[in-house]
């Protein structure tokens, strides 16, 4: 059995670790709430742009924007959003597993895959397995800015516009609740149709657009795609903070359980030490 002094040192070390994990849990909780607010604030904007795009596209019968036309798929581009930091449980691993299964399904159809990556964990992983990375962004921090994200988005948009890829998808972790984050893969280009499109059934009117619907549609589509990617980045960030909060809480609880076990071992060691001292005193007295 380890000595009492050694056990006390271990208990102090675990207590220090417990303080760190508890602090990280509290920080993650605060950041998660702020990110949730940012996530909720951006959704109405994104949804409204999507409805306007749908309305303009339906009103411009003679014009079909390239972003709305489906093609035969030979190459697929993926924007994969991971985290820059670890200590967030299996969040990134689940994302990587899901995307690799998706890539394998495309490969079985003789369709090649190119990547645009957000987050250093994704960059390290996908480059290590030899996948083609067209663009990547790291170091977005806890308050991501649209200007930092636009580069990777435009790279994929231009690749689609130039016929270098025939479809663009986005993969990220969607925030369901504090205990649940779901890996999502969604199609960005060509733009999927709205489900339950109310405009098609309820509205027979149209607006007058200046300078013309085509120019406006092109501008709105770019803005919409940027907004969708930004929302996914914020969603993934909320998932990261939630996963880190849960992981750090589990680490804090485990540290508490370990301290209790070590304290019990320490008490037994201390008891054994006292018993030995008493035995020595009794033996010495008997010898006298």
UniProtKB/Swiss-Prot annotation:
**Superkingdom to which the source organism belongs:** Bacteria
Can you cite a GO biological process for this protein? proton motive force-driven plasma membrane ATP synthesis
What binding partners and quaternary form does the record give? F-type ATPases have 2 components, CF(1) - the catalytic core - and CF(0) - the membrane proton channel. CF(1) has five subunits: alpha(3), beta(3), gamma(1), delta(1), epsilon(1). CF(0) has three main subunits: a, b and c.
What protein am I looking at? ATP synthase gamma chain
The family line of this record is: Belongs to the ATPase gamma chain family.
Question: What is known about what this protein does?
Answer: Produces ATP from ADP in the presence of a proton gradient across the membrane. The gamma chain is believed to be important in regulating ATPase activity and the flow of protons through the CF(0) complex.
This protein's membrane topology, according to the annotation, is:
Peripheral membrane protein
Which coarse location class applies to the principal site listed for this UniProt protein? membrane
């Amino acid at each position: 059995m380890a000595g009492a002094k050694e056990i006390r040192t271990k208990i102090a070390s675990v207590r220090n670790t417990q303080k760190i994990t508890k602090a990280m849990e509290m920080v993650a909780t605060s950041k998660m709430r702020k990110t949730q607010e940012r996530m909720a604030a951006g959704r109405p904007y994104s949804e409204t742009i999507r409805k306007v795009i749908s309305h303009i596209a339906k009103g411009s019968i003679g014009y079909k924007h390239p972003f709305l036309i489906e093609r035969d798929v030979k190459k697929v581009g993926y924007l994969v959003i991971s985290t820059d930091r670890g200590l967030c449980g299996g969040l990134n691993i689940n994302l990587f597993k899901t995307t690799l299964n998706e890539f394998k399904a495309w490969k079985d159809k003789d369709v090649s895959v190119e990547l645009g990556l957000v987050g250093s964990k994704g960059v390290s992983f996908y480059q290590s397995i030899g996948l083609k990375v067209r663009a990547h962004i790291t170091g977005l921090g806890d308050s991501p800015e649209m200007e930092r994200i636009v580069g990777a988005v435009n790279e994929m948009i231009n690749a689609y516009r130039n016929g270098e890829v025939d479809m663009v998808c986005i993969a990220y972790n969607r925030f369901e609740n504090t205990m649940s984050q779901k890996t999502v893969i969604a199609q960005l280009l060509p733009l999927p149709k709205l489900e339950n499109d109310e405009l098609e059934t309820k509205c027979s009117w149209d607006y007058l657009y200046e300078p013309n619907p085509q120019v406006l549609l092109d501008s709105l589509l770019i803005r919409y795609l940027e907004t969708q990617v930004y929302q996914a980045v914020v969603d993934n960030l909320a998932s990261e903070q939630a996963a880190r909060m849960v992981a750090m809480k589990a680490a804090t609880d485990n540290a508490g359980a370990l301290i209790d076990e070590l304290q019990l071992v320490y008490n037994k060691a201390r008891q054994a030490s006292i018993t030995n001292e008493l035995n020595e005193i009794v033996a010495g007295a008997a010898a006298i």
